[in-house]
């Protein structure tokens, strides 16, 4: 039986609907109000844990690190020393359910306990049907029974090791295991809230072809596009992202027909995105029925313009498939990019389209990682940021300093998320400067490196119309009179210092050469507070 036979209703505005899914089961489960949930503040979506916003200064472990509690023992203190507040760790179907119906949660329990001992929050990744476009983490009893658990075919008649997304048996087995995991997490963590989010599968999709060609897939592909899919597109036609409108527009926005008739030469990828999204959405929904933590799906990105589906995992939540995933998986609260590409700013912009909350669960762990965190959190008010392979970083890595500064600012950042009073910036390639209005003034920032060409970046928070918290490194800043507000400006006062437990602890009072015209933030991340005044 194909899973397309199962009908779902199309969702309304996506972020509203997904947030409701996070909140609705609370009363039924009897959980307290501190359970992790998503909440809207202005234009931003916040993760609320125990009634307070949590901005995740995170890191993702290497794939196999969390498969051994002994291996993790020396890693936990290192993670804490890097000033993380959240760790992203994988748990796999093959270790959780090594025999059908027999579950082993010892790793889950040990990871939760390790995080608690070091005052860290956890995001668990569910490695199951998909991990990087493959299925290596399904249990042996699934791998070896290809009759009961049918496989994806890259071409007709040729089996692969990857489970097909079109099989009811496949999705039921995955969803049952994930539901058991969520039930157990509720039992052991439903009051302490160490686990704050769940990633459902990992970089799902099909490679090296654009779609599945197994008998179930061929049958479904030849049929009309499911009515609920078309109803979603029709209902959201005016707010679809440009990529969706371009794809659908090739058929002059046909409202019915086969996949090829409606989506033309993009039909294979759209079909894959919808069927994989439906599958993962059902897995997530089964988990939320047990314990409704926020849940997301992550994407292996299109690597360059013109790259064809199948050269990256076809059907995954790449930016151009966001609307298709929203139609297919309303139980998924957000879609998240794994960013290893150079154009970090453009990718962040793509993944904030139509209200998608930005969370970056994987990113390069190079010397720019800290600046990327400043940018994502300051410019896009992201839920969090995580370099991959965090356990490979030395305790003296530069990220430690960036996370220390950001960590000290988190209460203030949370207060200003979703408002124009929080702005982030980051030097990209040959960028020389950036300007923006903030408070009652116009900020003029020049990037300047004092340590061999390293880039600059940071964030600015207007705590009052004339008072600014400035953080980051390798830039200088001045404030000019805002638009339609004539006059000259100067610094009234500048303090160097730090926030401790949300309160400002002043250090040096800067003046003279250090504060003339432009204020310089040098090669080490730091925090300054400046007050500006206007005169005729």
Say what each PLM segment does.
Residues 282-292, 320-413:
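Catalytic-core region of carbohydrate-active enzymes that cleave or remodel glycosidic bonds
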Residues 2-18:
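Bacterial N-terminal signal peptides that target proteins for export
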Residues 31-84:
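N-terminal carbohydrate-binding accessory modules
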Residues 71-146, 277-290:
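Aromatic-lined substrate-binding rim segments of carbohydrate-active enzymes
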Residues 66-80, 313-328:
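Short, acidic/polar
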Residues 147-322:
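Polysaccharide-binding and catalytic clefts of secreted carbohydrate-active enzymes
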């Amino acid at each position: 039986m194909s899973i397309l036979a199962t009908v779902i209703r199309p969702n309304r505005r996506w972020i509203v609907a997904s947030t409701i899914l996070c909140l609705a089961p609370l009363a039924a489960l009897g959980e307290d109000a501190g359970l992790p949930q998503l909440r809207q503040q202005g234009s931003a979506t916040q993760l609320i844990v125990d009634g307070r916003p949590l901005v995740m200064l995170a890191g993702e472990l290497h794939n196999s690190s969390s498969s051994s509690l002994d291996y993790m023992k020396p890693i936990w203190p290192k993670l804490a020393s890097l000033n993380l507040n959240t760790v992203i760790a994988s748990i796999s179907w093959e270790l959780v359910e090594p025999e059908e119906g027999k579950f082993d949660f010892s790793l889950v329990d040990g990871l939760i306990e390790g995080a608690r001992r070091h005052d860290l929050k956890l995001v668990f990744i569910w490695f199951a049907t998909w991990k990087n476009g493959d299925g290596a983490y399904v249990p042996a009893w699934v791998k070896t029974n290809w009759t009961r658990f049918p496989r994806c075919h890259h071409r007709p008649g040729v089996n692969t090791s990857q489970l097909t997304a079109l099989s009811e048996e496949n999705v039921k087995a995955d969803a049952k295991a994930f539901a058991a995991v969520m039930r157990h997490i509720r039992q052991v963590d439903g009051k302490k809230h160490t686990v704050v989010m769940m990633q459902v599968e990992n970089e799902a999709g099909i490679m090296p072809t654009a779609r599945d060609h197994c008998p179930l897939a061929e049958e479904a592909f030849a049929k009309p596009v499911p009515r609920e899919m078309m109803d979603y597109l029709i209902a959201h036609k005016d707010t679809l992202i440009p990529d969706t409108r371009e794809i659908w527009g090739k058929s002059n926005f046909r409202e019915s027909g086969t996949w090829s008739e409606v989506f033309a030469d993009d039909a294979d990828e759209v079909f894959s995105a919808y069927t994989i999204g439906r599958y993962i959405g059902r897995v997530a929904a089964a988990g939320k029925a047990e314990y409704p933590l926020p849940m997301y799906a992550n994407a292996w990105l299109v690597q360059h313009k013109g790259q064809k589906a199948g050269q990256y995992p076809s059907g995954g939540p790449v930016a151009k498939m966001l609307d298709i995933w929203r139609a297919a998986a309303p139980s998924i609260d957000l879609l998240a990019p794994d960013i290893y590409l150079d154009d970090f700013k453009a990718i962040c912009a793509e993944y904030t389209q139509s209200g998608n909350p930005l969370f970056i669960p994987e990113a390069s762990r190079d010397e720019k990682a800290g600046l990327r965190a400043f940018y994502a959190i300051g410019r896009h008010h992201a839920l969090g940021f995580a370099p991959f392979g965090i356990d490979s970083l030395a305790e003296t890595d530069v990220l430690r300093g960036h996370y220390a500064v950001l960590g000290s600012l988190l209460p203030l950042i949370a207060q200003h998320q979703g408002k124009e009073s929080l702005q982030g910036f980051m030097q990209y390639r040959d960028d020389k400067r950036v300007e923006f209005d903030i408070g009652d003034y116009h900020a003029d920032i020049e990037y300047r490196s004092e340590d061999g060409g390293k880039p600059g970046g940071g964030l600015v928070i207007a705590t009052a119309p004339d008072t600014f918290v400035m953080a980051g490194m390798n830039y200088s800043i001045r404030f000019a009179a805002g638009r339609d507000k004539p006059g000259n400006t100067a610094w009234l006062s500048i303090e160097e210092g730090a926030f401790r437990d949300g309160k400002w602890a002043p250090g040096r009072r800067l003046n003279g050469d250090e504060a003339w015209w432009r204020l310089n933030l040098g090669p080490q991340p730091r925090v300054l507070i400046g007050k500006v005044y206007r005169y005729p």
